[in-house]
Amino acid sequence: MLLGGPPRSPRSGTSPKGPWSSTGHVQFGKSPQTWPRRTRPRSPEPAAPSGVRGSTWTRRRDSPRRAGPTALSRYVGHLWMGRRPPSPEARGPVPRSSAASRARRSLASPGISPGPLTATIGGAVAGGGPRQGRAEAHKEVFPGQRVGKMAAPMELFCWSGGWGLPSVDLDSLAVLTYARFTGAPLKVHKISNPWQSPSGTLPALRTSHGEVISVPHKIITHLRKEKYNADYDLSARQGADTLAFMSLLEEKLLPVLVHTFWIDTKNYVEVTRKWYAEAMPFPLNFFLPGRMQRQYMERLQLLTGEHRPEDEEELEKELYREARECLTLLSQRLGSQKFFFGDAPASLDAFVFSYLALLLQAKLPSGKLQVHLRGLHNLCAYCTHILSLYFPWDGAEVPPQRQTPAGPETEEEPYRRRNQILSVLAGLAAMVGYALLSGIVSIQRATPARAPGTRTLGMAEEDEEE
């Protein structure tokens, strides 16, 4: 077909630039790899006509005959312009991406607007298709992202429960309540041996990165950094009220709470020391409750300051009077609300609950402040509501039945008794060994005593022999 001649179809037309002076060859058919081998030499490359800018390919590209994407897309990879196609031997091996590169060049031509089929080809070449793009998106890994690994959960070590509470320790109960309010994903270990904690004290938090935090307010600060913040919706005024009431609790209510459980002789012997002695393993139950009492006495001295022994009775009356005023103020601030700042709990509710629940649930023989607290009905209902809502089984008097309670308990009972007996024997052996090594106890071999007439009889026998 000679270019520049009259159009052969209604769709074709004369180029707006006029008929082309050079002749070219357009051949539609099979791929050049299937053509027979040529025997005659190649025809020379036709020179571009004078007065026309660009090569034959550029002029052919700008022709309006190439404006139809549907007609062109069928022949992508089978169209050669300007000269006869060479033989496969002369061209050499064709790379696999030749058809894709030709399609990409045809799509980049300014005279072609991509149609449905052209857009599909371009998407397959450039992006690998929608399925491949989604597959590659799933394989993408961002900086700092762990592939195939999940972060270790946070672990909270706290004192075990008693008296109908999830924990009998003030700090442990406050941290545990705050975690329940925020829904923090914690793996809770309720233990009665502080030496099993990673820090040696309770409560303690082991973060997902392995860091150990043992101070209660630092534990709560870490939970807030992990986006578990119970005070997120509080206003500036409510935040200021939280700080004010927290200071009031530490200054007015905490000294009386320490005095009630650890200093008052009757309460300490019949309630506090009894619970810790029964919960702790041997031999910690012999000396650890007394050590904890001394620590709380030092803490109370820091809170109240130094005072003379004769002023202890007057100081105790003053502390209990201020504590009753603090409870009355809390009752007035709570009113008929579910929580101190509305229908959602905050950090203040966690600390107030930990203070009030210990006073309310423990069966104290000497409960001066407990009587006043039970007279404030809204505070009692407040504690009961939190226990039933956030600790339905931990705070209940009757714990839920286990599915297989007989198996592990019956197996552990003889081993527990055996361990206790072995511990006692090991302690006795250590004491006896220490006494022998230090010289407190010495073992001497006893010489046999001779009878009184033995020496006289021996002397008589010697005289007879002489």
Swiss-Prot record:
Listed PANTHER family: METAXIN RELATED (PTHR12289), METAXIN-1 (PTHR12289:SF34)
Compartments where located: Membrane; Mitochondrion outer membrane
Native species: Homo sapiens
Mitochondrion among keywords: yes
Flavoprotein is among the record's keywords: no
Gene expressing this chain: MTX1
Keywords attached to this entry: Isopeptide bond, Membrane, Mitochondrion, Mitochondrion outer membrane, Protein transport, Transmembrane, Transmembrane helix, Transport, Ubl conjugation
Functional note: Involved in transport of proteins into the mitochondrion. Essential for embryonic development.
Covalent link Glycyl lysine isopeptide (Lys-Gly) (interchain with G-Cter in ubiquitin), residues: K187, K190, K227, K317
The protein's name: Metaxin-1
